[in-house]
């Protein structure tokens, strides 16, 4: 994380003003993307600037860097970063490997086909080379979805959704989110009733408004 913090300040200066779109800064920004991947850090603004520079300078397009940007965007689900990044990549490059595979993985995650996601990822593990913390970041997103969707879930299903975790690995994630399991194999997620917070709506009506209504009704 030390290298990331050092580069962050420098990159922040590069992204100010018109210099943001100077192609001479691409090498620095691309190294910054690689540092994010290695140190499990993230800077969406800088990554979008890289993709914008690729749009303006197609000859400088780097497939590997773009793939890293997309994978980092996936680690920030449920935020819309992945969609933002995808929209800045032209159709021809979207058809290239490994970008095509990453877009497919993103589609599986966004549509909550979690078991299919892990299966597809297992067949393309080379995509994660140089990417630190990707799988656990995805598991955080899946736990977020489970937390707002389920009250109870089968233990075996939860393990599958999180990537075929072992029993001990599953216990770690359950403990992290305060989930408990009973003897029947059911995991208690939360009571939806406890999650519902009523809103008190108060409308302030001044005297002039009331008097005008009363006058019009007479």
Curated annotation (Swiss-Prot):
SUPFAM superfamilies: ARM repeat (SSF48371), Winged helix' DNA-binding domain (SSF46785)
Disulfide bonds: none
Compartment annotation: Nucleus; Cytoplasm
One of the GO biological process terms: formation of cytoplasmic translation initiation complex
Gene Ontology cellular component list: cytosol; eukaryotic 43S preinitiation complex; eukaryotic 48S preinitiation complex; eukaryotic translation initiation factor 3 complex; nucleus
Record's keyword terms, sorted: Acetylation, Cytoplasm, Initiation factor, Nucleus, Phosphoprotein, Protein biosynthesis
Modified residues (Phosphothreonine): 28
Main localization, broad class: nucleus
Signal peptide from the UniProt entry: none
PTM annotation (N-acetylalanine): residues: 2
Sample GO molecular function, one term: translation initiation factor activity
Pfam families attached to this UniProt entry: CSN8_PSD8_EIF3K
PCI domain residues: 42-204
Modified residues (Phosphoserine): 217
Subunit structure: Component of the eukaryotic translation initiation factor 3 (eIF-3) complex, which is composed of 13 subunits: EIF3A, EIF3B, EIF3C, EIF3D, EIF3E, EIF3F, EIF3G, EIF3H, EIF3I, EIF3J, EIF3K, EIF3L and EIF3M. The eIF-3 complex appears to include 3 stable modules: module A is composed of EIF3A, EIF3B, EIF3G and EIF3I; module B is composed of EIF3F, EIF3H, and EIF3M; and module C is composed of EIF3C, EIF3D, EIF3E, EIF3K and EIF3L. EIF3C of module C binds EIF3B of module A and EIF3H of module B, thereby linking the three modules. EIF3J is a labile subunit that binds to the eIF-3 complex via EIF3B.
UniProt-recorded name of the protein: Eukaryotic translation initiation factor 3 subunit K
Organism: Mus musculus (Mouse)
Gene from which the chain derives: Eif3k
